[in-house]
């Protein structure tokens, strides 16, 4: 059997040694950065209440620049009620050189101020349309990047093969 490992990191403790280990041993790596600087720093302050974006971003760039081409990564952001303009976060990732991107909705109790609510859904749908236009414009300019939600098979969904065949163990 061929076993492949995935790791998710917020990047804070990444150093050259860990980057080398990840690039040698992990088939897939998920780089967790909530979005552009103000979005990430609002959700992920450091212990001294300073933002973490500027600490993490150079480490993530180094990881992907040194990553073997036969191994994968995604930079993964999160959109919340506080950044319903999440297409800006996707564009931030693309403009920073990340070719494989994903931005997922936050999951949380509605009592959290950042939680998505039913009344936010029209804005979320509108923002996906905005993102589609921006994505198409970048592709026309020759700037190729992938956005996970636009890569999903709309007829089968991302997990249909696994549901039909089992986990394979």
Residue spans of the language-model regions?
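Radical SAM enzyme [4Fe-4S]-AdoMet core and its adjacent flexible, acidic
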Residues: 38, 42-61, 65, 69-162, ...
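Conserved SAM/AdoMet-binding glycine-rich loop
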Residues: 1-37
């Amino acid at each position: 059997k061929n076993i492949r490992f995935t790791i998710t990191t917020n990047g804070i403790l990444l150093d050259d040694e860990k980057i080398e280990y990840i690039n040698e041993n992990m088939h897939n790596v998920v780089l967790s950065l909530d979005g552009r600087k103000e979005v990430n720093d609002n959700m992920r302050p450091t212990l001294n209440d300073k933002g973490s974006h500027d600490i993490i971003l150079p480490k993530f760039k180094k990881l992907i620049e040194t990553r073997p081409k036969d191994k994968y990564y995604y930079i993964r952001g999160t959109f919340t009620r506080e950044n319903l303009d999440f297409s800006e976060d996707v564009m931030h990732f693309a403009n920073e050189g990340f070719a494989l991107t994903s931005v997922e909705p936050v999951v949380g109790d509605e009592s959290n101020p950042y939680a998505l609510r039913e009344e936010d859904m029209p804005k979320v749908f509108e923002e996906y349309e905005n993102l589609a236009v921006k994505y198409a414009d970048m592709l026309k300019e020759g700037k190729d990047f992938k956005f996970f939600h636009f890569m999903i098979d709309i007829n089968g969904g991302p997990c249909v093969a696994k549901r039909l065949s089992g986990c394979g163990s």
